[in-house]
């Protein structure tokens, strides 16, 4: 399958940032990640986005000269919440780099805020990557280990069976050819 990443859009994003065109730079960064993000998940002004990623929904808002990025993570369980919060504190200190976990009643979310002028595309890419990685890596573990529940159910879109068969056959051929080459 073809990658949804467009490298020229990243370079354009950096150029736009260096010219002080911060919102356009962020739009280009989103285009780099996936050309459909802005049209599928953004508002017409390009100042608000709600992008699904696995079991989290990443909310991005541009308002009053700031980016606000947040993602609801999990609902805290009745039992085991103290132990879970200890592990969340560890993630806050050791795994989340710029974003942080925030407790809002019985809900945990990751959030990050910065001014438009401090939003270099490289930094914003890693902020989004960090939020998505932590959301992917720890949601199942905390649901299983502590009984937490998801704030957002993943939207899974399956590939058509013929696409699955084509990819599987391609991998089988690649494996056979590789084994033949190393004999």
Feature locations, PLM:
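Pleckstrin homology
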Residues: 137-145
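Well-ordered alpha/beta subsegment
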Residues: 102-126
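Charged, amphipathic alpha-helical linkers/stalks
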Residues: 144-183
């Amino acid at each position: 399958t073809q990658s949804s990443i467009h490298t020229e859009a990243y370079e354009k994003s950096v150029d736009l940032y260096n010219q002080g065109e911060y919102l356009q730079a962020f739009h280009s960064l989103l285009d780099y990640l996936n050309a459909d993000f802005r049209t599928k998940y953004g508002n017409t002004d390009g100042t608000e986005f709600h992008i699904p990623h696995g079991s989290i929904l990443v909310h991005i808002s541009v308002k009053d000269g700031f980016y606000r990025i947040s993602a609801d993570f999990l609902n805290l369980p009745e039992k085991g919440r103290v132990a879970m919060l200890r592990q969340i504190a560890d993630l806050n200190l050791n795994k989340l780099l710029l974003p942080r976990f925030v407790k809002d009643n019985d809900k945990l979310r990751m959030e990050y805020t910065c001014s438009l002028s401090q939003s270099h595309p490289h930094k914003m890419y890693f902020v989004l990557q960090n939020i998505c990685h932590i959301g992917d890596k720890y949601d199942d573990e905390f649901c299983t280990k502590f009984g937490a529940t998801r704030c957002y159910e993943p939207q899974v879109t399956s590939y058509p069976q013929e696409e699955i068969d084509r990819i599987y056959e391609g991998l089988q051929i690649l494996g056979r050819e590789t084994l033949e080459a190393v004999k």
